[in-house]
Amino acid sequence: MMLRLTSVSCFLLVIACLNLFQVVLTRRCFPPGTFCSRYLPCCSGRCCSGWCTRRCSPRYGKRATFQE
């Protein structure tokens, strides 16, 4: 009986530790110059085009090109 109780306690302790590690790892943030997304936030600055930067630079698209 004691062996069964110990193994169940050990199993529950492992599950609790894994849940704790998951919370710690999912709440981390990334420094400038690394990849970011909606679910992987930047520590400081903003996520611009998938990269952590201090400020977003203006985007130049087809409307910003010079046409003759």
From Swiss-Prot:
Disulfide bonds: C29-C43, C36-C48, C42-C52, C47-C56
Residue span(s) of the pro-peptide: 64-68
InterPro entries membership: Conotoxin-I_CS, Conotoxin_I2
Pfam family, one: Conotoxin_I2
Ligase found in the keyword field: no
Keywords assigned: Amidation, Cleavage on pair of basic residues, Disulfide bond, Secreted, Signal, Toxin
GO molecular function: toxin activity
Signal sequence region: 1-26
Record bears the keyword Disulfide bond: yes
Location, primary (coarse class): secreted
Modified residues (Tyrosine amide): Y60
Location(s), subcellular: Secreted
Tissues expressed in: Expressed by the venom duct.
Entry's Gene Ontology cellular component terms: extracellular region
PROSITE patterns membership: I_CONOTOXIN
Domains as described in the record: The cysteine framework is XI (C-C-CC-CC-C-C).
Sequence similarity: Belongs to the conotoxin I2 superfamily.
Protein name: Conotoxin Mi11.1
Organism: Conus miles (Soldier cone)
